[in-house]
C-alpha cells in the first residue's frame, strides 16, 4: 500500500514540476469548475444521461424522484411525498436509501457516511437544481466508493454574471392535504469579490398517507471568484432544517387493503428532525494549456433524530411495546386506540464527513497519439454516532434500563470512525480519428474503527447488574478496480460505446448493523456494457435514440433472508453470485426540428428490461404459517429473481405546443412487479415486510405558459396520478409504504 501511494505521489508531483517548467500564466476568458458546470456526461466513457433544467421545467414532476424515474435503468421509490429519503437505484441496485450508489451534489457526497452508512435522507430541493447527471459505465471509477451500479450528481444553479433573480411559488392539493413550495434566489457580480447567489427554499407538503408532512427550510449560498487570470474559486455554503411528521414504520397487508391512506391515523407523534450543514471550496488552476488542477475541500455535518410512538410488528403498524403506552402492542387502526401515557423511542444519529480531493487533467502525446489524462487522489474522514433510547412523554429518559456511565442513552450507543484513501487514473487515448480507448483504474482503501456500547436487553428490570455487552473491532480493506471503455464515432450521427470495469461497495450498516457488518464482505462486481447512440434521423424526422445492453455480475451481494422469526426483519446476508442482464432504450422525437409549423408535437420514450438472477445454490427459509411461525427449509433459490429488482420499467410522454411559448403533455409511467425476498414469495406477508409487489401504471399531465412580456416568467399546472391509482411504493423491514395519490400543483416562476 505504501509503495503504491509513493508511486502515485511522485506522479502527481512530476506533473506539477512539468507545469512549473512551462508558461506560468495563461489568460483564459472563462474558467469553469469541472464539478459544477453543465453537461459533463458527454465527456465520460460509457453509458451516461443528463437531464437539464429546461426538461425538468417541461415535465413538472411532483418530486425530483419523478424526474429520476424517466432515466432508463434508474428507479426511484417515492414513499415520503417529497423524495427526501432518496430511494434511488441504478441497474439492479437495491434502492433503499440509495445505499448502493454514490449520490452527489456538485460532486460533494450526499451519502451521509459513504464508506459505512451511505444512507441518504436528503437531496437538494428541485427548485435549485440546474441539472442531473447519471453515470452508469466505466466512467464512475473516478468517483466512489460505490462503483458497481452508477452515480447520480445534482448540479446547482451557478451564480449569474449579471444581476438576476427568480421567485417560484407552487400551491396545490393532494388527496391527503395541501402542498406548498416557495423558492427565491438572486445573484449578481460583486466585482473583485466575484459572482454570488443566495437561495431560500421552503417545502410544506403532505405525504401519501395521513400523518405524513414533509416540512423543511433550505438556505443556500454559492459564489464564483476569479482569483487571477487562470485561477477560480467556487464556494458553497448550505444549511437545511427539517421538522417533518413521518412514521418510519409501514403497514401490514390487511391495513393496506383496508385503508391505504390511513397512516398513523394522526393519533401518534411520529416525527423526523434533521439539521444539515454543508460547505465546500473548489479551486481550479490552469497551469498551462495542457494542465488543469482541481482541488475540492468539503465538510458535511448531519444531525438527525426520529421520535416514534408506532412500529411495524408481525400484524402490521402498531403502538410501540417499549414506551409504556396504554394501548401498547395494539394496531393503530383498532377502535379506541390511544397514545395515552406514551413515551417515545428516540434514535439520534450524528455524521461528520470531511474530504480533500485533487484532480489533474493533463493533455499529452504518447507514441504519437493524443492522450487526455485524468488522475487524482482523495482523502476522506467519517465519524458516525448512532444512539437509541426510550423516553417518557416529556421526551426525557425514563424506564428500567440502566444508563451507561451516567449518560442518557441506555438502549444503544455506538460510534465509528473511517479513514479512507482513493487513487484513480483514467486516460482517453485517441487511437484513431474515430476511436477513443479509455483505460482506467481505481484504488480504494479504508480503515474502520467501531465501538459498540449496547446494553443487554432488560438490564436493570430484574436486578441484573452484569449489563455490559460491549464490542469493539477494527477493519481495513484494500482493493484495485480496473476498467476499460471505448467510444467509436462511426460518423457524425452514430456513436458506439462500451466498456467493462470492476466495481465495489463496502458493507453498509443499513445491511445488518455495525455489529454484524464485520461479518459481511464488500460487494464486488464485474460490469459489461455495449451501447449505440443514433442521430441519423434528427434533421429529417426529429428523432434520436439510444440503446444499451449490459451485464452486472455481483459477488457477495447482501440480500434479505426469508427467515421471518421475530426480530429478524432487517437481517441481511451475503448471498454469493448474482447476474443482472438488461437492455435500456430511450428515444426522443421533436417535430419542431424539421417542421416549419408554429405548433408541433413532441414525445419521449424510455424502457428498461432486467433479468436479475441469483446464481448460487442455497436453501431458502420459510415459516409454516404466519410471519413468526416455525421456520422450515424450502427449495433451492438458484435462478430465483434478485430481491427488489423489477424486470420492466417504462415511460412514455406525448406533448404538443409552441416552442418558447406554451406546451401541454401527458406521461404514462410503468413499474413492473418484483420480489422482496430470496424465496420469491408470491404474496405479501401479514407484516408487510416481504413478498411480491404488484406492477402499476401512473398517468400524469402538465402544462406551461410563458409570459414573454414579463421577463419570460412561466405559469404552470401539474397533475400527478390522475386516476388515483393505489400502489405499493416500497417494502422494507419497517413494513410496506404506499405511493402518492392524486395531486394537483399550480404556480408561477417570476424572473426579475
Residue ranges with predicted function:
Residues 65-108:
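Extracytoplasmic beta-strand/coil segments of soluble accessory domains associated
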Residues 108-136:
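Short acidic/polar hinge/loop motifs at secondary-structure boundaries
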Residues 164, 173-204, 208-247, 271-287, ...:
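Transmembrane beta-barrel wall of Gram-negative outer-membrane proteins
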Residues 187, 238, 427, 498, ...:
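Conserved C-terminal beta-signal and adjacent last beta-strands/turns
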Residues 229-238, 274-313, 317, 321-455, ...:
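Face-selective signature of the C-terminal outer-membrane beta-barrel domain
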Residues 243-245, 249-254, 383, 447-449, ...:
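Surface-exposed extracellular loop regions of Gram-negative outer-membrane beta-barrel proteins
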Residues 284-288, 292-310, 489, 495-499, ...:
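Membrane-embedded beta-barrel scaffold of Gram-negative outer-membrane proteins
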Residues 361, 432-433, 437, 540-553, ...:
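Gram-negative outer-membrane beta-barrel transporters
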Amino acid at each position: 500500500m505504501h509503495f503504491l501511494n509513493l508511486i502515485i505521489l511522485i506522479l502527481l508531483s512530476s506533473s506539477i514540476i512539468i507545469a512549473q517548467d512551462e508558461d506560468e500564466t495563461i489568460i483564459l476568458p472563462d474558467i469553469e469548475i469541472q464539478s459544477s458546470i453543465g453537461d459533463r456526461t458527454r465527456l465520460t466513457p460509457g453509458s451516461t444521461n443528463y437531464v437539464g433544467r429546461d426538461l425538468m421545467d417541461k415535465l413538472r414532476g411532483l418530486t425530483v424522484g419523478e424526474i429520476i424515474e424517466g432515466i432508463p435503468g434508474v428507479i426511484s421509490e417515492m414513499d415520503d411525498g417529497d423524495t427526501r429519503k432518496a430511494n434511488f437505484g441504478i441497474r439492479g441496485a437495491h434502492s433503499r436509501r440509495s445505499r448502493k450508489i454514490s449520490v452527489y451534489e456538485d460532486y460533494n457526497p450526499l451519502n451521509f457516511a459513504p464508506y459505512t452508512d451511505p444512507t441518504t435522507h436528503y437531496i437538494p430541493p428541485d427548485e435549485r437544481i440546474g441539472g442531473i447527471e447519471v453515470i452508469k459505465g466505466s466512467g464512475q471509477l473516478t468517483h466512489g466508493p460505490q462503483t458497481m451500479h452508477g452515480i447520480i450528481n445534482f448540479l446547482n444553479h451557478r451564480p449569474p454574471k449579471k444581476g438576476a433573480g427568480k421567485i417560484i411559488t407552487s400551491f396545490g392539493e393532494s388527496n391527503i392535504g395541501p402542498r406548498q413550495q416557495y423558492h427565491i434566489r438572486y445573484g449578481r457580480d460583486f466585482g473583485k469579490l466575484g459572482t454570488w447567489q443566495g437561495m431560500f427554499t421552503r417545502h410544506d407538503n403532505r405525504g401519501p398517507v395521513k400523518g405524513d408532512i414533509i416540512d423543511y427550510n433550505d438556505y443556500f449560498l454559492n459564489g464564483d471568484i476569479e482569483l487571477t487570470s487562470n485561477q477560480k474559486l467556487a464556494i458553497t455554503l448550505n444549511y437545511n432544517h427539517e421538522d417533518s411528521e413521518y412514521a418510519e414504520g409501514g403497514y401490514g397487508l390487511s391495513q393496506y387493503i383496508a385503508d391505504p391512506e390511513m397512516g398513523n391515523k394522526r393519533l401518534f407523534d411520529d416525527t423526523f428532525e434533521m439539521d444539515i450543514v454543508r460547505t465546500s471550496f473548489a479551486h481550479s488552476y490552469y497551469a498551462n494549456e495542457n494542465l488543469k488542477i482541481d482541488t475540492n475541500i468539503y465538510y458535511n455535518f448531519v444531525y438527525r433524530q426520529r421520535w416514534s410512538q408506532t412500529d411495524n410488528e408481525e400484524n402490521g403498524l402498531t403502538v410501540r411495546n417499549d414506551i409504556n403506552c396504554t394501548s401498547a402492542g395494539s394496531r393503530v387502526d383498532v377502535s379506541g386506540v390511544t397514545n395515552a401515557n406514551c413515551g417515545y423511542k428516540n434514535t439520534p444519529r450524528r455524521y461528520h464527513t470531511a474530504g480533500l480531493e485533487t484532480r489533474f487533467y493533463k493533455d499529452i502525446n504518447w507514441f504519437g497519439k493524443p492522450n487526455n489524462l485524468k488522475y487524482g487522489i482523495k482523502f476522506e474522514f467519517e465519524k458516525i454516532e448512532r444512539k437509541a433510547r426510550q423516553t417518557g412523554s416529556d421526551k426525557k429518559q425514563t424506564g428500567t434500563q440502566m444508563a451507561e456511565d451516567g449518560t442518557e442513552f441506555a438502549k444503544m450507543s455506538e460510534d465509528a470512525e473511517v479513514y479512507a484513501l482513493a487513487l484513480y487514473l483514467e486516460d482517453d487515448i485517441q487511437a484513431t480519428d474515430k476511436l477513443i480507448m479509455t483505460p482506467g483504474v481505481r484504488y480504494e482503501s479504508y480503515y474502520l474503527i467501531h465501538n459498540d456500547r449496547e446494553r443487554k436487553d432488560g438490564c436493570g428490570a430484574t436486578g441484573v447488574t452484569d449489563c455490559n455487552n460491549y464490542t469493539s473491532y477494527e477493519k481495513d480493506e484494500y482493493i484495485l478496480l480496473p476498467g476499460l471503455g471505448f467510444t467509436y464515432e462511426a460518423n457524425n450521427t452514430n456513436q458506439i460505446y462500451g466498456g467493462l470495469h470492476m466495481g465495489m461497495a463496502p458493507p453498509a450498516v443499513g445491511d445488518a448493523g455495525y455489529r454484524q457488518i464485520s461479518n459481511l464482505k464488500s460487494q464486488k462486481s464485474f460490469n459489461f456494457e455495449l451501447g449505440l447512440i443514433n442521430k441519423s434521423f434528427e434533421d429529417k424526422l426529429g428523432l434520436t435514440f439510444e440503446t444499451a445492453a449490459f451485464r452486472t455480475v455481483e459477488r457477495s451481494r447482501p440480500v434479505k433472508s426469508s427467515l421471518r422469526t421475530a426480530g429478524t426483519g432487517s437481517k441481511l446476508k451475503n448471498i454469493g453470485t448474482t447476474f443482472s442482464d438488461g437492455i435500456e432504450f430511450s428515444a426522443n422525437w421533436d417535430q419542431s426540428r424539421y417542421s416549419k409549423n408554429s405548433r408541433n408535437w413532441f414525445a419521449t420514450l424510455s424502457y428498461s428490461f432486467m433479468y436479475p438472477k441469483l446464481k448460487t445454490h442455497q436453501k431458502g427459509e420459510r415459516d409454516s404459517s404466519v410471519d413468526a411461525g416455525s421456520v422450515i427449509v424450502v427449495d433451492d433459490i438458484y435462478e430465483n429473481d434478485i430481491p427488489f429488482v423489477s424486470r420492466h420499467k417504462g415511460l412514455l410522454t406525448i406533448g404538443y405546443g409552441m416552442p418558447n411559448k406554451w406546451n401541454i403533455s401527458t406521461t404514462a409511467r410503468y413499474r413492473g412487479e418484483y420480489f422482496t425476498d430470496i424465496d420469491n414469495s408470491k404474496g405479501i406477508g401479514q407484516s408487510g415486510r416481504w413478498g411480491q409487489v404488484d406492477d402499476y401504471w401512473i398517468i400524469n399531465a402538465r402544462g406551461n405558459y410563458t409570459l414573454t412580456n414579463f421577463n419570460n416568467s412561466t405559469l404552470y399546472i401539474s397533475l400527478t396520478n390522475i386516476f388515483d391509482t393505489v400502489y405499493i411504493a416500497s417494502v422494507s423491514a419497517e413494513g410496506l409504504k404506499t405511493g402518492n395519490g392524486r395531486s394537483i400543483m399550480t404556480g408561477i416562476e417570476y424572473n426579475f
